[in-house]
Amino acid sequence: RDVLGSRGLGDVYKRQTQIIAAGAPHGNFGSDSDVFCKLVPFWQLELYFGKVLGRTPLQQSDKGGFYPDVYEYIRTHDNLRTAGEQQTEFVYICSLIAKANLLDFFTKWGFLTPVDITVDDYGTGKLTVTQARIDEIRSRVEALGYPKPDVALEYITDNSVELYKDKPGIVAGTATRSGSTFTMTNWKNVAAYEVVDETGKKVCISDGLLAPSGTATFTMKTAWKDGFKVYAVSATGARTAVTF
């Protein structure tokens, strides 16, 4: 948290939503391939399982929790041979410890997207994730039989923890659009805004509110097109159409 805070949480979360919209592999975010963006999904797991559900040493009397149990599992099992195997195994480990099917979350973050690249970060290393390995992990997670989280986990931020605790419905406000810039006024309980094209593919995603305020403004990198739609997304993932 301190590291993310030093970079400006608002900026990191803004770039995070662009990464999810692009569907990029976790090890290859293009212009956003810095360690701070890559840290976001790990922090989101702590926000949800730790701060929302209380599975943290700060709240458990036995000083256990989601991440302590993940670390203990990794400590007591043999290391896998490659970085790609380790990255994908993390999906299984987290689902096992959380007792939740986290495939959707990790898919959106690109952990289960094929990639074959050389990563240069304190030295170079190979990151290869094959479709066969992805299929194996998916099968193993599904075999656990755990339910999916009842929240839009990929959109949780430090500012929306209370939303994810209480899971209130969206209260619609008003919205205006000027070119590719959107201004949302007096919307409440919004975890994120999504702009999708006519096929339903995400074009742009924005934090519901980066800081407590009655107004949220965001700008797409692409031009607005006929057929685009905007949705306000609640903590549960329920979507409310935004009209202008």
Ranges and model annotations:
Residues K14-T118, Y122, L127-T130:
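Active-site-proximal alpha-helical
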Residues D2-Y13:
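Single conserved hydrophobic/aromatic residue that forms the stacking wall/gate
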Residues T82-F244:
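Beta/coil-rich, acidic/histidine-enriched accessory regions frequently appended to metallopeptidases
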